From Swiss-Prot:
Subunit structure: Part of the 50S ribosomal subunit. Forms a bridge to the 30S subunit in the 70S ribosome.
InterPro entries in alphabetical order: NA-bd_OB-fold (IPR012340), Rib_uL2_dom2 (IPR014722), Ribosomal_uL2 (IPR002171), Ribosomal_uL2_bac/org-type (IPR005880), Ribosomal_uL2_C (IPR022669), Ribosomal_uL2_CS (IPR022671), Ribosomal_uL2_dom3 (IPR014726), Ribosomal_uL2_RNA-bd_dom (IPR022666)
One Gene Ontology biological process: cytoplasmic translation
Protein family (similarity comment): Belongs to the universal ribosomal protein uL2 family.
Gene3D superfamilies xref list: 2.30.30.30, Nucleic acid-binding proteins (2.40.50.140), Ribosomal protein L2, domain 3 (4.10.950.10)
NCBIfam families attached to this UniProt entry: rplB_bact (TIGR01171)
SMART domains: Ribosomal_L2 (SM01383), Ribosomal_L2_C (SM01382)
Taxonomic source organism: Zymomonas mobilis subsp. mobilis (strain ATCC 31821 / ZM4 / CP4)
Name the record gives this protein: Large ribosomal subunit protein uL2
Biased composition (Basic residues): 269-278
Function text: One of the primary rRNA binding proteins. Required for association of the 30S and 50S subunits to form the 70S ribosome, for tRNA binding and peptide bond formation. It has been suggested to have peptidyltransferase activity; this is somewhat controversial. Makes several contacts with the 16S rRNA in the 70S ribosome.
Length: 278
């Protein structure tokens, strides 16, 4: 998908750059593959605000996307590529030979009418899913499982991908976009190709309202508040906060390490933080 640059016919159009979605499906999603979605406004079940900057936005239906791809050896045909308000990537509606419909993440270079298949070993072709241990070295993949049959968890955002760089004792080594290298079990499923809509990050919304349509509220800096409202607040004149960045509740933020799953540290060959540690 290309980027669309708008002429400044009004202040809200000056500098506006959006992804050209003219080739996407213009109708409604498949009703059987959608669910209702309640907005939380960033509040938990007690009504306490746990996430800042969330609220409002256009009403959305949740699309049931198949991240598992476990319908073995049954070819499917791409019916259409659709916009999905719940994620940055596009989704593809596919119809299997038994006439069942399913949504999958749309990879780059996948078009209407293309045939795809999920198998233990499949051709290296965008949209095909296979066990990562069967894919050749150097293959670009996305929607990567961390546990067999759990469904893809890595490389699902727009433009994301990982590359297979090696094999070792029933494990496969992959390199992620972040620079992290890690082991994945060879019987985990992956989908060939990079995720669609790689230009998503290059958009310029040009006005605050477009962020509000997406449910994003303005965020006030802590240093602009009073001491009662934020740990960075107060001070005479402009100050820098005087401490490492924290949330309104005093917890470290902006790059602070929060990873606590020590059990899977052994699968990480090279941390994405390796450059920062030097």
């Amino acid at each position: 998908m290309a980027l669309k640059h708008y002429n400044p016919t009004s202040p809200a159009r000056r500098g506006l750059i959006l992804v050209d979605r003219s080739s996407l499906w213009k109708g409604s999603p498949v009703k059987a593959l959608t669910e209702g979605k309640n907005k939380t406004g960033g509040r938990n079940n007690k009504g306490h605000r746990t996430s800042r900057g969330i609220g409002g936005g256009h009403k959305q239906k949740y699309r049931l996307v198949d991240f598992k791809r476990r319908k073995w050896d049954m070819p499917a045909t791409v019916q259409r590529i659709e916009y999905d308000p719940n994620r940055s990537a596009f989704i593809a509606l596919v119809e299997y030979e038994d006439k069942t419909l399913s949504y999958i993440l749309a990879p780059q270079r996948l078009g209407v009418g293309d045939s795809i298949v999920a198998s233990r070993k499949a051709d290296v072709k965008p949209g095909n899913a296979m066990e990562i241990g069967q894919a050749p070295l150097g293959t670009i993949v996305h929607n990567i499982e961390l546990k067999p049959s759990k469904g893809g968890q890595l490389a699902r955002a727009a433009g994301a991908y990982a590359q297979i760089v090696g094999r070792d004792k029933g494990m496969v080594m992959i390199r992620l976009n972040s620079g992290e290298q890690r082991y994945i079990r060879s019987d985990c499923m992956v989908t060939v190709g990079a995720v669609s809509n790689s230009d998503n990050a290059n958009q310029n919304f040009a006005k605050a309202g477009r962020n509000r349509w997406l449910g994003r509220r303005p965020l006030t800096r802590g240093v602009a508040k009073n001491p009662v409202d934020h740990p960075h607040g107060g001070g005479e004149g402009r100050t820098s906060g005087g401490r490492h960045p924290v949330t309104p509740w005093g917890k470290p933020t902006k790059g602070a390490r929060t990873r606590s799953n020590k059990a899977t540290d052994k699968f990480i060959i090279r941390s994405r933080h390796a450059k920062k540690k030097r």
